[in-house]
């Protein structure tokens, strides 16, 4: 696995735990608009990983937290671009988690909790 998809969560530990354990080359965060557009929040996550001794590529993708069909389309699009991806479902909204379940069954990707 070179790419880990994270469902962004306001609880910071949910955004970094699996990534810190598996250390993929790339982490894609599906996140709300305010996070996707916040350099400060993105830098906080980047600083955490740097402090832990590595610098993965971080990609922040603006995503609806409540529209399952849109979330599913984004996940499928990411898996087409990064077929080596896995999905961490420790964070996110109920709609994101539902879309993640459908995505995992359609795309046959590994899922971590």
What spans do the regions from the language model cover?
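PLD/PLD-like phosphodiesterase catalytic module centered on the HKD motif
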Residues: 86-88, 92-93
């Amino acid at each position: 696995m070179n790419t880990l998809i994270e469902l962004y969560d306001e609880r910071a530990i949910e955004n970094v735990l699996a990534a810190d354990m598996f250390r993929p080359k790339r982490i894609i965060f599906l996140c709300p608009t305010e996070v996707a557009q916040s350099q400060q929040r993105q830098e906080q996550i980047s600083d955490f990983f740097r402090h832990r001794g590595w610098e993965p590529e971080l990609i922040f993708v603006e995503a609806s937290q409540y529209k399952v069909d849109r979330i599913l389309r984004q996940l499928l699009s990411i898996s087409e671009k990064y077929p080596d991806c896995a999905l961490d479902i420790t964070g996110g909204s109920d709609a994101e988690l539902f879309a993640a379940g459908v995505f995992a069954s359609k795309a046959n990707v590994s899922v971590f909790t």
